[in-house]
Amino acid sequence: MSVPIIVTATFGDGDNGWLQELRRAHYPPERNQVPAHLTLFRQLPPSLEGELATRLARAAAAPPPRATIAGIMDLGEGTALRVESEDLEAIRAELAAAFHGLLTPQDRTWGPHVTIQNKVTPRIARTLQQQLRAGFEPRPLAIRALAAWRYLGGAWAPIRSWPFRR
């Protein structure tokens, strides 16, 4: 059985703590099995692990990407924080071009976000979105590293993390 690889960006300590707290407060506990993250790819074939590691290490040799939490996203049955980052878009585009023929339909496009609530009723999701929009102002988001994970049917097992050069 092949276990897909997930690629994410992880956050600096301050932002990570804030995002984890939002997830603890609003994500159904039985579904909150992974840390706060920004997914770059959801399902890469495990056969890419070696080449992926080389490419992620090369990308992480640069300074951390600039990113901004730019808005609130309605996921229907959940809520996310929309992220804007030309730097992350460039990293992802290079990886997507390298693995083009191996991407799932879901991985062919990208809408960067951090999910803070999922699998709730649309009414509960809309209530949180209204609360978050009331005091929302765009803010910088510190990106610490790129990471690869094995998908285990809910939980994820870390493969490795590549911190950006400081």
Located regions from the model:
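Histidine-dependent nucleotide/RNA phosphoesterase domain, centered on the 2H-phosphoesterase fold
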Residues: 1-166
